[in-house]
């Protein structure tokens, strides 16, 4: 009974989110609550909700302060010199231009937002592609690949996986650093090859990176080196585990505000400017905590896993991560991030655990493609339409051109994960 009720709840959740009949927050709260009431748990289900919220709180705190921190750093101009350096280095050489596009996307995507990455990188590089006569599909592909392999502890897929499985984002990410470096190396190699194939016309004037008047008033060029050192310190202490991620970004944000915008009024304006992006995702993560808490505490998730395990050979459990890693990128075309990470991933992780595996391996396998390399071409994410529109290419043309390279990147990272023993074959 519990297994059937849990399956019905998950399918209802996925259906509501994919059909846009209600927002993810509404579905993540009301669907499991309704299932718990039908299952006879009554108001006792609230303790499961509280347990879920408690487990997700550190992840939510990290996300909020990471988004605010990188937003303030972008306002202060941390990225501007990097953009100018890349534009100056690439010159008129197609190979450098395409590789520079990927490098710039990797740097800008440090804030964890694919949309922001595309909004900064593509307008900055598009004039260069135009004056050199380069294929704009290459621009879209290079930016997409770089953002796709750049899964970080504070990016959406990692946070969702951590929230769904009650794990820390750092524990998921740290073993994947080598895999990510292999993915980045592959992206750079592909960009070199795409640039080598490209033909360029002689440019009479290379574009420059210009700022609006509003952006100029926010910039703090005299504090660039401090901001760079602070950012490296925040990321370094977080990855090495010296301090918890939420605390690292919290302290970093406070220092960034005091040094760059010492007036309290200016600090408030900067926080308000980025609060919407931070709180929207934070609300979804908190609702996901309610969902996972109810599904786990009520026993529905375990009942599904037990039922599925009874129909699978025990030896087959070891292959779940590698199969998921291979399929993760194409699955981005079928599931949006919320429906997959909060609906599908917990079931796969529970089955893998019951067959003798570690749930964290399933999370790491999902990160290889599900809404990482998959999001720039998935029709279920607005960012995929954004990258095509900003590049000035047809959406279907972008999909056809970029999909093989994005899938290849996920396959290369799957091989790397096996080689580094992140999960077994």
Residue ranges: model-predicted function:
Residues 1-4, 54-60, 86-100, 131-139, ...:
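Membrane-interfacial loop-to-helix junctions in multi-pass transporters
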Residues 4-9, 31, 38, 174, ...:
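Long, contiguous bundles of hydrophobic transmembrane helices that form the permeation core
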Residues 13-21, 70, 104-113, 144-150, ...:
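Transmembrane alpha-helix interface/packing and boundary motifs in multi-pass membrane proteins
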Residues 26, 45-80, 98, 106, ...:
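Core transmembrane alpha-helical segments of multi-pass membrane transporters/permeases
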Residues 55-63, 172-187, 242-245, 249, ...:
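Alpha-helical transmembrane segments
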Residues 64-65, 92-124, 311-355, 359-360, ...:
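Hydrophobic alpha-helical transmembrane segments of multi-pass integral membrane proteins
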Residues 68, 81-83, 116-128, 155-167, ...:
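Re-entrant/interfacial helical elements at transmembrane boundaries that shape
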Residues 127-221, 358, 368-369, 379-425:
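Membrane-core helix-loop-helix motifs of multi-pass transport proteins
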């Amino acid at each position: 009974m519990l297994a059937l009720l849990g399956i019905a709840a998950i399918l209802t959740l996925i259906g509501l989110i994919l059909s846009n009949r209600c927002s993810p927050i509404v579905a993540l709260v009301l669907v499991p609550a309704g299932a718990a009431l039908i299952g006879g748990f009554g108001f006792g289900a609230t303790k499961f909700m509280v347990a879920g919220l408690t487990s997700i709180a550190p992840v939510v705190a990290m996300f909020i302060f990471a988004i605010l921190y990188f937003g303030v750093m972008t306002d202060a101009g941390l990225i501007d010199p990097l953009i100018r350096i890349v534009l100056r280095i690439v010159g008129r050489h197609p190979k450098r231009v395409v590789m520079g596009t990927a490098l710039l996307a990797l740097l800008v995507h440090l804030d964890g937002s694919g949309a922001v990455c595309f909004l900064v990188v593509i307008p900055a590089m598009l004039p260069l592609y135009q004056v050199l006569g380069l294929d704009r599909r290459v621009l879209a592909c290079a930016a997409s690949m770089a953002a796709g392999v750049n899964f970080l502890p504070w990016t959406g897929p990692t946070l969702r996986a951590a929230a769904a499985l009650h794990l820390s984002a750092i524990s998921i990410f740290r073993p994947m650093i080598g895999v990510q470096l292999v993915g980045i190396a592959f992206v750079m190699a592909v960009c070199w090859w795409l640039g080598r194939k490209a033909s360029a016309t002689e440019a009479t004037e290379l574009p420059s990176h210009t700022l609006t008047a509003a952006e100029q008033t926010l910039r703090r060029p005299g504090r660039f080196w401090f901001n760079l050192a602070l950012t490296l310190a925040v990321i370094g202490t977080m990855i090495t585990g010296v301090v918890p991620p939420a605390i690292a970004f919290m302290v970093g944000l406070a220092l960034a505000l005091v040094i760059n915008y010492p007036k309290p009024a200016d600090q408030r304006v900067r926080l308000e400017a980025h609060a919407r992006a931070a709180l929207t995702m934070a609300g979804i993560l908190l609702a996901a905590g309610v969902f996972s808490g109810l599904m786990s505490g009520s026993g529905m998730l375990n009942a599904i896993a037990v039922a599925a395990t009874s129909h699978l050979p025990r030896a087959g459990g070891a292959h779940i991560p590698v199969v998921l890693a291979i399929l993760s990128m194409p699955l981005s075309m079928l599931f949006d991030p919320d429906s997959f990470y909060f609906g599908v991933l917990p079931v796969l992780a529970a089955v893998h655990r019951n067959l003798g595996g570690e749930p964290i391996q399933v999370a790491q396998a999902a990160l290889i493609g599900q809404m990482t390399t998959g999001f720039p071409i998935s029709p279920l994410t607005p960012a995929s339409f954004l990258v095509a529109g900003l590049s000035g290419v047809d959406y279907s043309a972008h999909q056809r051109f970029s999909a093989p390279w994005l899938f290849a990147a996920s396959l290369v990272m799957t091989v790397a994960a096996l080689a580094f023993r992140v999960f077994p074959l």
